[in-house]
């Protein structure tokens, strides 16, 4: 098994554990982003990892700090998870993860809004399952298909 495959497998398993934990408990334990950072050391590219951490995780930190409104919350666990994902993936795959994750989260929120017959602002979704889908998709897409 190549280092790229080991890294991708660990990345996927850690994101899956974050997704399950977030769905059950509505929080993400600090250990998961810490282990993701360690996973990012496999095939470590310092500039890409640092840029990914800042440019992928940074907007989530800003949103969590600046947007305070009923019905909208990005938790600290989500911010740490996205920063760690950016560290593992780098900038472009991290941005692909963000677009895929948030697009699916919005679609899911709209469907739930319709099914539950409640306003969109009342829908509460854990984000880690969407980050898991987007992260695994972005990793394997960029690792093998696009060769970025």
Question: What are the residue ranges of the model-derived segments?
Answer:
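A membrane-topology feature that recognizes alpha-helical transmembrane segments
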Residues: 1-148
């Amino acid at each position: 098994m190549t280092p790229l495959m080991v890294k991708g497998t660990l990345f996927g398993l850690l994101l899956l554990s974050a997704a399950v934990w977030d769905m059950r408990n509505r929080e993400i334990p600090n250990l998961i982003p810490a282990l993701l950072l360690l996973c990012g050391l496999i095939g470590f590219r310092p500039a890409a990892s640092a840029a990914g951490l800042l440019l992928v995780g940074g907007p989530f930190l800003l949103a969590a700090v600046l947007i305070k409104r009923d019905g909208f919350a990005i938790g600290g666990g989500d911010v740490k998870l996205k920063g760690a994902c950016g560290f593992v993936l780098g900038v472009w795959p991290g941005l692909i993860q963000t677009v895929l994750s948030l697009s699916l989260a919005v679609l899911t929120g709209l469907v739930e809004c319709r099914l539950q017959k409640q306003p969109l602002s009342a829908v509460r979704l854990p984000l880690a399952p969407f980050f898991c889908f987007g992260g695994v998709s972005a990793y394997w897409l960029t690792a093998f298909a696009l060769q970025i």
